[in-house]
A protein has these predicted regions:
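Sequence context surrounding c-type heme c attachment/ligation sites in exported
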Residues: 50, 67-68, 89-188
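Amphipathic alpha-helical substructures
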Residues: 1-84, 145-159
């Protein structure tokens, strides 16, 4: 998924935010274990988000078309209600890498530029926001924006540079494992 113009991302943005809210509602309303925030066997998505997830849905789990619903005029007039009603819990295959908060499209998108992934930003976010680890930028060091990977210089090469630099290694040893684990996903 590449969206250099940002049009598709702009259209999906409200759903990317709403996805986590709807996921939380399902866990709360169904009295599910909090462990589902870490790893769940389901996602809560709508039709536009399924363009990212690309799940093959059984007929009984087919996501509703808003126009098919009885009170469609009410729904079409209220954007927030329309978004909430269109989300559905969808069970995942056992082989799926999705499930839990960290694999949601909105969470993954937070730490990318929409064109390519950034294991450093993703790893730092998980280390700080989820695990509460302290990561301090060394004094007098500027962080450069990550350039798009090329055939001759990959993200792996950039990671190796940081790991081999003693100034960078202390933080990268904490955050890179998280960021690399999230490389199983594209920008979403």
């Amino acid at each position: 998924f590449r969206d250099r113009g940002g049009e598709k991302i702009a259209k999906l943005k409200p759903f990317l935010v709403q996805e986590s809210i709807e996921f939380f509602k399902v866990i709360l309303n169904e009295n599910l274990s909090l462990l589902n925030f870490i790893d769940s066997d389901f996602v809560v998505i709508n039709r536009p988000l399924n363009d990212i997830y690309k799940l093959e849905l059984p007929e009984e789990e087919e996501l509703p078309n808003i126009a098919d619903q009885k009170d469609s005029k009410l729904i079409l007039n209220d954007k927030k209600l329309r978004r909430q009603r269109a989300f559905r819990k969808v069970m995942l295959d056992k082989e799926s890498r999705r499930g839990g908060l960290l694999t949601q499209a909105g969470i993954l998108m937070m730490n990318t530029n929409g064109e390519f992934t950034n294991p450093f930003y993703r790893g730092a976010w998980v280390a700080q926001s989820i695990y509460g680890l302290e990561l301090e930028l060394p004094a007098n060091l500027e962080v450069e924006a990550l350039n798009a990977p090329t055939e001759t210089f990959t993200i792996k090469d950039t990671i190796n540079e940081h790991r081999n630099n003693p100034i960078c290694a202390s933080c990268h040893s904490k955050m890179d494992p998280f960021g690399l684990a999230m490389e199983n996903f594209d920008v979403f």
